[in-house]
Amino acid sequence: HVEVSAKKNGFDWEPVMRAIIQIESKGNPAAVNGPYVGVLQISPVLVKECNNILRSTGSTKRYSLSDRFNATKSKEMFVIIQGFYNPLNSIEKAIRLWSGGIRYNVAKTQAYLSKVLRHMSN
């Protein structure tokens, strides 16, 4: 069973997600940039990965591509990805992972990290 609220293992992802949402879409759930859509600019690959994670945990819950336009479901997918790839809840890793993918490059995600952290401190 995967916890799909903003709090995972007692960790609150809401401040991180709020900052990323401001940068990615300015909060517009209808935002589209190529294959990336919704408030968190989620790709089809990420939806598939969330469904694979859910399947591996025995959950019957699945996400569709249209769920990316739903802010709540987008946040749920963010939390699922972080829970799987970032089990220690590192804010830095969460931001780099969101920008650069699972095999992110530190140098290439540095500017994005700085931008998100600036938004979080405002």
Q: Language-model features: where?
A:
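Catalytic glycan-binding domains that act on GlcNAc-containing polysaccharides
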Residues: 1-122
